[in-house]
């Protein structure tokens, strides 16, 4: 695999501790489809594609580090891309309020982007959202509306509340769960960027699925560019993305891996372009994320851990494979969960991975 025409060199000599020395990889990527003069927002995208620094005993494994975005996740692309698209078609103008329902990475991304572009924003969050997450979003100046934990069809639910606030304040509700701009941003941006970095030399892309927008957009782009590249979505074991994909009976939605899985299919999941969906249980996702940090110096969250686990399975079965994993976010948000031994032991998960 080459990056923007530059050769990849791997030193055959092992360094300290038997690890293989690798030279830095230089990449050239296309310009962002959502250009900005803001120096902070200009850092969104063009994230590095690195060779995963651990043997897979099979195919080659690469990791796209979306953690290099300003708020540490791929949701920065979503936020900037959707806001720019809304501005371009006149649906978002000066003085408008941007509203979204999220307590995770999207909340931080929306808060940052609206802050830098001069829009007010309101984030609705479910009760029990950690003070750290609320504080992070507020640090960029967003309003927070905390909502009770009720059924999704209850008017007090945090998504219903976001929709209502947007209507009352004549604002824009981003609605990442059904907004077709979600996968479109990745079709226009992440897919082409990945293709150029890999110089088209890849056999698989493995991507965690929450809203499904990233996997769907990348899959559509690759289907048009090189149809034999397989895009593999990754679902939580106790989730219903895979059951919706394969048309099998759905079950309960119960996972502790943030940003992975959903209780049902969403409009942002373009299944017609995705080749397969594999499920990973919470324990394996967390253990793989911890291994990535301890053994490889790569700090990612549980959803990326799940994707790395799937990619390693593919690599073992396909020695000729060249697999890109989308690393959705940084692990620095999970020091009190995934990387906390006490938290892991309370749930019966092993901690001898490091």
Tell me the role of every PLM-derived stretch.
Residues 2-354:
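PLP-dependent amino-acid enzyme catalytic core
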